[in-house]
């Protein structure tokens, strides 16, 4: 398949590895820092001058929301990363015929719209996106920002009642979360790095929900941490040394901060759910992108 990279899992040593490991022991999840008022004020203050200098940055969400979703682990100077990171994903999706400009698309864990803004702001081969795009997330602040910055004709965003330790949500815990959308209603269900924060029971729940919501022939695409295709940060920021069931986790104190799985386990689970085909694909750029679990209904 196009864009699949045999070398995407190869990684090398990184500078500052010791410092990075030390910082990650103190702060396994930078997302939690973005709820601190002092941290928010500081990082948003650094955003003022770039917004004045570059018109392209003025439509971006505030810096603390960008940091919360993970923009290359950068606290500052992350604007370009936010703007371009989804480009290869959509080029792959449309060039491979996984979705079209008229498709119904569900983004689970939409955050502040890093993937959605491409379908709002850009044309593909001269055609504008005219389908429907639904984004769901547990982060009420991020969803509110999206609702205020996207047109309601094509885009709809709503808050999930699911829970997450890493994302500081306070809703009542549920063992099984059902996304309040109709069966067989989407051509593409995808997420960016959602699975990297899901332990086994929640992982299975979201894979089953993806299957339920897809139309026949539709595709599920979830980026994730994969032991057989390790990230560029493997051996520095990430080691996944702790096992919890079929999951490999980075931090026992905050197990949802970073979760990885083996390919065989993911494929077996997806086939049990009912998907007809499963594969791991990589976007251009190699290990800087997470591998994607691509399954067809």
Model regions and ranges:
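Short catalytic micro-motifs in class I SAM-dependent methyltransferases
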Residues: 193-194
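A conserved beta-strand element that flanks and buttresses the S-adenosyl-L-methionine
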Residues: 190
């Amino acid at each position: 398949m196009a864009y699949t990279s045999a070398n995407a899992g190869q990684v090398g040593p990184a500078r500052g590895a010791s410092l990075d490991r030390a910082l990650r022991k103190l702060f396994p999840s930078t997302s939690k820092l973005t709820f601190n008022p002092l941290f928010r004020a500081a990082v948003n203050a650094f955003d003022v001058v770039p917004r004045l200098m570059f018109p392209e940055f003025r439509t971006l969400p505030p810096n603390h929301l960008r940091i919360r979703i993970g923009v290359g682990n950068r606290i500052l100077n992350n604007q370009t990363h936010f703007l371009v990171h989804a480009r290869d994903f959509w080029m792959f999706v449309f060039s491979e015929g996984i979705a079209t400009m008229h498709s119904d698309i569900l983004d689970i864990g939409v955050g502040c719209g890093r993937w959605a803004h491409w379908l709002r702001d850009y044309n593909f081969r001269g055609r504008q996106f005219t389908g429907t795009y639904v984004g769901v997330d547990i982060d009420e602040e991020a969803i509110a920002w999206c609702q205020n910055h996207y047109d309601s004709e094509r885009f709809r965003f709503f808050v999930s009642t699911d829970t997450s330790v890493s994302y500081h949500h306070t809703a009542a815990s549920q063992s099984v979360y059902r996304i309040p959308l109709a069966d067989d209603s989407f051509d593409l269900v995808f997420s960016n790095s959602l699975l990297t924060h899901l332990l086994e029971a929640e992982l299975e729940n979201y894979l089953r929900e993806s299957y339920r919501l897809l139309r026949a022939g539709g595709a599920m695409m979830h980026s994730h941490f994969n032991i057989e295709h390790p990230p560029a940060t493997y051996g520095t920021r990430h080691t996944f040394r702790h096992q919890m069931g079929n999951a490999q986790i980075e931090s026992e104190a905050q197990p949802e901060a970073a979760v990885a799985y083996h390919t065989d386990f993911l494929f077996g689970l997806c086939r049990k759910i009912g998907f007809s085909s499963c594969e791991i694909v990589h976007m251009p750029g190699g290990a800087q992108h997470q591998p994607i679990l691509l399954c067809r209904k």
